[in-house]
């Protein structure tokens, strides 16, 4: 019997309204929500769909933040919009740029809370890693975010806002009247920042509806990857309601080790998780599932682990991303040696699976995989203390 996923309803997202009595922030509203809001503000129902489409394109295609600039709308209608609505994004507190070009943004959201967003430029593409929660409930022992307690879920607007802020910083909004440029600086999006996306399903789903909309931010679902530690009851919903690529934060080949590295395994173990994945490619029209596997020296990197991994995922269209562990202050683990990682990858490759080794990016600014944590929450524990807590 499958358990219901705990969607942390005890940690409610803040409403999209500005201070009491203020206008409604439309960033993150779905098309249906925006149209209903326009009607409630006095837009005639027969015009609502057209007006919604016009506002949508101004906000998400052109990046406009001022209703007065929406020049294909009548002046009195622009005034009505300004009276009832606002276009408000989170605030960039700091921006750090790594020696390799990676950018890390510390972003302040409603309530003064902070999350981190990372932009990774690569040859021919640019990947944006966004956060879905302030902190995390999962306490994965190798992950820096897991040492920060969950504060709250992000709203759909706060998730979409991360994309818009980075496009601001990169100057990626099109210029009206200029020739069309198909180059995309933000071409890929990964939900791999702070938090477990499937513990904030509704807001993540609604945010992705905005991000994937062809008349706005227009990122293809094939270029969006959601990474989950294994919230089994929400995996089928992800396929049906979002349909993006799926990555599994796997990291171990036995329940004994995964219970420690990824404690959610105690609720949904390896077999239960893998059984839930077999239909995902068909339901979502995805080619394959990505298994993420962090390489920890002496913990999960043996030849036996590699052979078990291949056996476990047999029958699931997949690839395995091997991630050299990115250390953070107080981390209880060390990165596997390059030779050990290469030997592990070779076993997987010879079994017929792609096994790329991820090149760490942004390590010098603590922006690499597993290193994100709100700057105001960087409480440092000693390596011995965390090792004692995890039992390794």
From Swiss-Prot:
Cellular localisation: Cytoplasm
Superkingdom of the organism of origin: Bacteria
| Pfam families tied to this protein | Radical_SAM, RlmN_N
UniProt-annotated catalytic positions: 116 (proton acceptor), 369 (s-methylcysteine intermediate)
**What keyword terms does UniProt attach to this protein?**
4Fe-4S, Cytoplasm, Disulfide bond, Iron, Iron-sulfur, Metal-binding, Methyltransferase, rRNA processing, S-adenosyl-L-methionine, Transferase, tRNA processing
Q: Which GO terms describe its cellular component?
A: cytoplasm
Task: Report residues binding [4Fe-4S] cluster.
Answer: 136, 140, 143
| Cofactors (names) | [4Fe-4S] cluster
Misc remark: Reaction proceeds by a ping-pong mechanism involving intermediate methylation of a conserved cysteine residue.
Which family does the similarity line name? Answer: Belongs to the radical SAM superfamily. RlmN family.
* Functional description taken from the UniProt entry: Specifically methylates position 2 of adenine 2503 in 23S rRNA and position 2 of adenine 37 in tRNAs. m2A2503 modification seems to play a crucial role in the proofreading step occurring at the peptidyl transferase center and thus would serve to optimize ribosomal fidelity.
Record's protein name:
Dual-specificity RNA methyltransferase RlmN
Source species of the chain: Cereibacter sphaeroides (strain ATCC 17025 / ATH 2.4.3)
Gene name linked to the record: rlmN
